[in-house]
Amino acid sequence: PIGEETIKNLKLLFQKDTKEWNKPKYEIARASISSKKLDVEEIASMTLPSVVKLEGDSGLGSGFFINNEGLIVTNMHVVAGGDKEFTISGDDGLKDQGEVIYVDSKLDFALIQANNIKNSKALPLCFSKYPRPGQNVIALGSPLGLAGTVTRGIVSAVRQPSSDLEDVVPYYVTLIQTDAAISPGNSGGPLVNSNGEVVGVNTWSLPGDEGRAQNLNFAISIVDILRSLNSENPGKAENTNSCGNIVEKENIFKFW
């Protein structure tokens, strides 16, 4: 069974929010994806410019851009300290302030709007399908404030919360289990597949100790987040991959 301390920590993540938030309207744009599977170095170089460190008075975390107008996804527990304004910084010298505009406590995610960034590089999203066990993934973020950190692993499982967590994590939350390391400060960063598409938002890890399993890390599915936002999927198109993005025959990789 899962320990009492872990359940206590999860209750802090998936807590009820008494504030009413106006749900923003978000339309998904298809990305153009190379037909070639990319190695970790390629994915990191293309993804890191879209990953940011978030700093508030109560702590820090990670996030990433989902559109070209400075809209950032992160975890709710990153912004749960009461801060409304956050400092946004990127691995490439990017610096700005941003404001929390939406919080979903049931799925532990939040949206932050950057004040001045209007040409952000959005990451492609795997919006139409959950990943499969065994797929390669990398986690990006700022563990302990160390911006631009990349860890690699596989999807260990895609699961609904176990019976141990049924009173803590909502039943409709899909957890992506991975052995890619997720550490404090990594929360809110993207978990991406070998095409560089976001499959989840890094959320928490199960602390390991003597007699317990190691490398149990979890992300919230981007599919569930987009569904919660009532995001509008683009219409049907030819040459799309399982994530819904357009596959290019050439060995290129570009964002919309």
Model-identified regions with their sequence ranges:
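Active-site substrate-binding loop(s) of clan PA
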Residues: E42-I43, E99-I101, A114-A147, S183
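A conserved glycine-rich beta-strand in the N-terminal activation segment of trypsin-fold
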Residues: K36-E41, S50-E69, L94-Q97, A122-P124, ...
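Short, surface-exposed secondary-structure boundary micro-motifs
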Residues: D57, N75-H77, S142-P143, T203-W204
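Active-site region of chymotrypsin-like
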Residues: L48-S50, A114-P124, V150-N230
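N-terminal activation segment of mature serine protease catalytic domains
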Residues: I2-F65, M76, D83-K84, F109, ...
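Short conserved beta-strand and strand-loop elements enriched in small hydrophobics
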Residues: L54, K84-D91, V137-G141
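Catalytic-histidine neighborhood of serine endopeptidases
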Residues: E5, L60, N67-D108, A114-N119
